[in-house]
């Protein structure tokens, strides 16, 4: 890559990083292109050299950051660990994003997942759920997970729990420090995996037998 191309990419990244900070602080709809340019320390006109509009900036922020998460989650599925450990890794990846890049999480939760244009991105947003479903199905096939649960519903429940925790941190409803993130990982994963277990199925069947007896 030439020196000019490298400088251009660095400037583009500088603008995107600034946009994340501005969107996280002010919200997408109340932010102006000028706010992003000022945060990035570039001329207003230079921003339009890289992006045609504020909407394109947001779309790029989503596509690049979400893409990184999807790559990491897909890498987990491609491994040979037991399904329960794969689900644990997926939860850790998603929840620890809050510790590493909280502003990115704020933008993804507030400005992307709950925006009026969410239907335009639904295919990308549901990909983690599809991966989780695939992991659960493999766990059922191996006998690690109970066979009487719907993997599609179980995947939505698993991902939904993580999404609600992230939303709670974004909205300030819960503390999101290191200890709280670690506790959330244990709680979400251990509680749900206990419900997915074959032992839980056997216990449920025994209780139903007692009731019907």
Whereabouts are the PLM-identified features?
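N-terminal intrinsically disordered/low-complexity leader segments
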Residues: 1-10, 21, 171, 200-213
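Helix-turn-helix
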Residues: 10, 14, 22-56, 60
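Short coil/turn segments at alpha/beta junctions that flank glycine-rich nucleotide-binding fingerprints
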Residues: 25-29, 80, 101, 142
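All-alpha amphipathic helical-bundle segments outside canonical DNA-binding/catalytic cores
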Residues: 85-89, 120-126, 141-157, 179-183, ...
